[in-house]
């Protein structure tokens, strides 16, 4: 979480409020899609794995993992495809930010990668082994910070050099650097968002390396459940968890749908007030871009700092749930 904050705060210095608005718009769509497709996978896999091990059915735990990989890989691929297909429509007509489309497309691959990684993550956590998850989380955070900041800085730095040399930027000549900077912000934001997909891939690679080091020993002749039975159980148990995660993520999605529109209406209704109080920002990004600037400042900076402390509370689940599930399976309850 600290590395994540180190990523977003300097990123805000590069992209500014406007660029962070593009960045946050991509996350605004990604969060509910992730909630539906992948958010509940670690919890369900953790619980089922712990129960199978407690019941002395390691073979069934391994088969559940294999079935879950096939099922959720397909669901993740569908989620990635839908995000990519509807990215332009979402950016233009729902988020009212057409410039965010490249960033939305860049985050699409993360959906499928997260689904696969979540299965392996939950499987190991169900064996009360959180080291693979911790190593993957660190790999994700570090790679996201390095790749994201490098991409964003690289785009801005190259555009500045081309402007100073009098060269075209994105196929167009600009007489003023502020206009050139505004033009390359969507590309810089997309580069920063692409780091999310790259970081998820790095986390998955870390999990796969850890996965080879610890495998359950399956006794010969162990009876396992049918694949169809396991699939039904996975779907049945993930629905309430995914629904809960979706409700929590809907708050940020509702913000995405309403905050920018409300600010745009407010600027149009009383432009004199906003020019008087935010004249410098309007001079930089225009009256139409003020709403996106404010939204980016709210989600990209303020909420990043605010969420640091609450995020630690959710970590207790990682150690508590496998033990609770195993005790429940053994009927070892007071």
Protein language model regions, located:
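Signature of the first transmembrane helix
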Residues: 1-43, 80, 240, 244-258
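Interfacial/gating helices of multi-pass transporter permease domains
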Residues: 11-32, 99, 182-190, 229-237, ...
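Helix-loop junctions and terminal segments of transmembrane helices
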Residues: 39-54, 306, 310-330
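Short membrane-interface helical motifs at transmembrane helix boundaries
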Residues: 78-102, 158
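Alpha-helical transmembrane segments of multi-pass membrane proteins
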Residues: 85, 96-120
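Membrane-interface junctions at transmembrane-helix termini in multi-pass inner-membrane proteins
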Residues: 114-137
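Alpha-helical transmembrane segments of multi-pass membrane transporters
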Residues: 135-184
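Interhelical loop/hinge segments that connect adjacent transmembrane helices in multipass membrane
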Residues: 163-193, 205-248
């Amino acid at each position: 979480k600290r590395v994540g904050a180190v990523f977003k705060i300097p990123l805000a210095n590069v992209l500014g409020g406007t660029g962070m608005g593009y960045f946050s718009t991509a996350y605004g769509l990604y969060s509910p899609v992730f909630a539906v497709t992948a958010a509940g996978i670690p919890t369900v896999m953790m619980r089922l794995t712990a129960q199978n091990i407690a019941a002395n059915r390691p073979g069934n735990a391994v088969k559940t993992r294999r079935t879950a990989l096939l099922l959720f890989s397909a669901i993740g691929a569908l989620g990635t495809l839908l995000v990519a297909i509807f990215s332009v429509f979402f950016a233009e007509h729902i988020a009212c930010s057409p410039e965010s489309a490249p960033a939305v497309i860049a985050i699409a691959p993360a959906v499928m990668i997260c689904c696969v990684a979540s299965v392996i993550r939950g499987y190991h956590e169900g064996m009360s082994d959180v080291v693979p998850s911790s190593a993957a989380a660190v790999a994700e955070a570090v790679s996201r910070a390095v790749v994201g900041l490098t991409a964003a800085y690289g785009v801005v730095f190259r555009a500045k050099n081309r402007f100073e040399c009098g060269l075209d930027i994105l196929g167009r000549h600009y007489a003023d650097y502020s206009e050139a900077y505004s033009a390359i912000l969507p590309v810089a934001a997309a580069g920063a968002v692409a780091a999310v997909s790259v970081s998820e891939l790095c986390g998955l690679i870390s999990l796969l390396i850890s996965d080879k080091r610890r495998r359950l020993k399956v006794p010969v002749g162990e009876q396992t459940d049918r694949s169809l039975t396991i699939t039904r159980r996975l779907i049945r148990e993930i629905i309430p968890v995914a629904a809960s995660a979706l409700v929590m993520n809907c708050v940020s999605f509702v913000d995405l749908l309403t905050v920018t529109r409300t600010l745009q209406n407010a600027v149009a209704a009383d432009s004199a007030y906003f020019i008087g109080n935010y004249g410098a920002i309007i001079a930089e990004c225009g009256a139409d871009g003020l709403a996106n600037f404010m939204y980016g400042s709210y989600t990209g900076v303020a909420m990043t700092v605010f969420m640091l402390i609450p995020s630690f509370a959710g970590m207790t689940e990682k150690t508590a749930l496998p033990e609770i599930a195993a005790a429940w399976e053994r009927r070892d309850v007071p």
